[in-house]
C-alpha cells in the first residue's frame, strides 16, 4: 500500500528530506547542512559530491526514523536551489570543479560581453530572463573557458551539465537518466520558453555544446526509478521536479491566474501565476515557467531579492548581535521604529526590480542613538521593503491588484516581519499551517504523476491557513517609510 511521498528539498545551505502523507501533512523530516565555499570575493561554490552524499543520507535517515519502508513510498519529488551549476564527467561521475552557486558573481564580465554584443533583447524575448550572473548559462561558459580540459571534454561529448535536480536524478538512477524539468530549464538563460526547447542561437552565442544539456520534461512526470539498493527494498519512481520557488508556488496551491506567493529563505522570492500568458515585464521582473503538467505549461512573473534570511545570518555570525534567528522578533519588538536606520542587503548586488550587479550592502541613517534593536529591526524591515518593490512592479506588469499574499519559508514564522509585511504592502498576508510548502510542492507534483493525488482540486481542498495578518498602518506613515527605503537603495547602487 502506497501511503507516502518523499520530498527532497535541496537548498542553498542544507539538504532535507521530508515524508508527507495523503493529507499533505509532514510525517518525518531530516536535515544536514553542507559547506559554503568562498574562494574569492563575490564567488560562492558548493561541493556537488557532498550535496549528493548528504541528500541521499537524509533520505535514508527519514526512512529509518519513521519506520516507513520503500514499498510504502508512492514517489520521490525533488525541489532544488535553482541556477546552481554542476558540470561533470559522465564516465567517472565526478564534477570537473565545484558547483557554481546562484549567488556567485564571477561571471559579471561574461554578462557585460553578452550585453555589448547586443543580445539583451533577444535573450529577454526568448528566455524571459535578463542577462545576469545569477543564471546558469554564463556559469557553464565560465567552467568551459577556465577549467583545464573542460572544453575539450565537452566537445567530445564527455561532460554533462545539470542544475541540482538533474545532478540528483542522475545519481539516483546511477547515471541512466539525464533530465530536467521545464522550471529549472527556464532558469538557465539557454531555454526558449515559447518553443520549450534549448535555443541553438543562445548556445552558439555562449559557445556551449548542446550535447551537455539534459532532456527537458514536465514538472510532474516519471523520469526514472531509484536502484533497489539505493534506499534498500524496492525501486521508487522519481516523479516530480521543480525549482524551489516554483515548487513553493505549487505547494501553496497558487493554481489560478493572479495568485501569488512570497518565499522568505536565503533570498526572497515572489512569484505570480500568469496562467497561459507570457507577460514580458517592463519593470525589471523575470518571466518564467511556473510548472508543466501533462501537455500544459503555466507561466509566472518573478521578482527575486538575493539576500533575506542571509542578512539575519550575517547579524548572527558576523556582527554577533544575536545568538539565534528567532531572537530578531524579540529585539524588533523592543522599539517602535528603527530610529531612522535603513539597511540595504545588497551583499551580492541587487535583484528585481533594480538588477544592479555592482550595488553593495549599506547601513544608513546611523546616529549615536542607534542601538542593536534598531539595526535588527532595520534588517527585518528591509526584507519587507524588497518584497514591496517586487509587488509594485508585478502589479504594473500584470495589471492585477493582489488581494492577498501567501507566504512560506523560514522567516515567515517571524510574526513581527509578517505584520510589517502586511502593513507596508497594505494587503492581508496568509501563513499556512504547513510551512514546508517548497517540499510539499515537489511532493504534490510527484504524487500527481503517479496518481497518489488525482487532480489539483484534491490538493486545494487539503490546504489550511494558520494565521492571517491584516494591514494596520496609516497610509501617510506607509508612504514616508517607503520613501526612506527608496532613498537608501539609491545610495547603495553602482558602488563596486
Curated annotation (Swiss-Prot):
Question: Where is ATP bound in this sequence?
Answer: 12-14, 266, 309, 313, 410
- Keywords carried by this UniProt record: ATP-binding, Glycerol metabolism, Kinase, Nucleotide-binding, Transferase
Query: Its pathway?
Result: Polyol metabolism; glycerol degradation via glycerol kinase pathway; sn-glycerol 3-phosphate from glycerol: step 1/1
The alphabetized list of GO BP terms reads: glycerol catabolic process; glycerol metabolic process; glycerol-3-phosphate metabolic process
Q: How is its activity regulated?
A: Inhibited by fructose 1,6-bisphosphate (FBP).
Q: Cite the binding residues for glycerol.
A: 82-83, 134, 244-245
Quote the catalytic activity from the record.
glycerol + ATP = sn-glycerol 3-phosphate + ADP + H(+)
Q: Where does sn-glycerol 3-phosphate bind?
A: 12, 82-83, 134, 244
Q: Which GO terms describe its molecular function?
A: ATP binding; glycerol kinase activity
What parts of the sequence cross the membrane?
none
Give the domain of life.
Bacteria
Which cysteine pairs make disulfide bonds?
none
Alphabetized SUPFAM superfamilies for the sequence: Actin-like ATPase domain
> Is this entry keyworded Glycoprotein?
no
Q: Name the positions where ADP binds.
A: 12, 16, 266, 309, 410, 414
Gene3D superfamilies from the entry?
A: 3.30.420.40
GO cellular component terms, alphabetically, are: cytosol
Q: What is its EC number?
A: 2.7.1.30
Looking at the Swiss-Prot or TrEMBL record, what is one Pfam family this protein matches?
A: FGGY_C
Fetch the CDD domains from UniProt. FGGY_EcGK_like (cd07786)
What role does this protein play?
Answer: Key enzyme in the regulation of glycerol uptake and metabolism. Catalyzes the phosphorylation of glycerol to yield sn-glycerol 3-phosphate.
Family, according to the entry, reads as follows: Belongs to the FGGY kinase family.
- State the name under which the record lists this protein: Glycerol kinase
- Report the gene name: glpK
